A protein has these predicted regions:
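N-terminal membrane-targeting/pre-transmembrane regions
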Residues: 1-45
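Short acidic/polar mixed-charge low-complexity motifs
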Residues: 3, 110-111, 134-136
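A short, sequence-level motif marking secondary-structure junctions
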Residues: 13, 113-119, 140-144
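Canonical alpha-helical transmembrane segments
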Residues: 46-49, 69-77
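Hydrophobic alpha-helical transmembrane segments
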Residues: 51-67
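Conserved beta-hairpin
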Residues: 72-111
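Phosphoinositide-dependent membrane-docking surfaces
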Residues: 103-127
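A membrane-cytosol interface segment of integral membrane proteins
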Residues: 128-163
């Protein structure tokens, strides 16, 4: 690798929420939980049938509340608690820098072994570097352009595979 990539960004509430949402959406997409919304909708339909046939609205009420939560309030509630925890975080408003060069990958001048990264995910919001028990989010705005972001992801993917 001849080109050195260097990105830096300030870790503020907006970027924190972007990263949390990107990770949440990616992890939900690959989880069985993604089917819960469909189950709640099916329960609502069953509740409508019960309400029309037997006049009972218990199932309809409960399933409607679940659908509203799942599709309307789930992220808002999560966002509230994330913001609350971020306000007390020691990482709030810190500057981070990531360097990728011939010597390796560095986060705030600390080396990251490519063997410790088990997956890299590129989203519109940024790049997620997944480790065993956590992840690092690098917002798209930290990269100079889309080509640098694509190159960063491509190089990391090659290094993870051991090439």
């Amino acid at each position: 690798m001849s080109k050195s990539l260097h990105v830096s960004y300030n870790w503020n509430t907006k970027k924190f929420l972007q990263g949390a949402k990107a990770a949440y959406d990616y992890e939900l997409k690959n989880s069985r939980k993604r089917f819960l919304g469909w189950i709640f909708i099916a329960l609502t339909q069953f509740g409508v049938v019960l309400a029309l046939k037997q006049g009972t609205i218990g199932m309809l009420t409960l399933s409607t509340i679940l659908v509203l939560y799942w599709y309307g309030f789930r992220w808002k509630i999560r966002e509230y608690f994330l913001i609350k925890s971020f306000k007390n975080s020691p990482l709030k408003d810190k500057s981070f820098e990531v360097k990728l060069n011939d010597e390796g990958l560095f986060f705030n001048n600390s080396p990251i072994d490519f063997k410790d990264i088990y997956e890299i995910v590129s989203t519109d919001e940024g790049v997620l570097l997944y480790f065993i028990d956590n992840y690092i989010f690098i917002p798209s705005s930290a990269f100079e352009n889309l080509e640098d972001k694509s190159e960063f992801v491509k190089i990391i993917k090659r290094k993870i595979k051991g090439e």
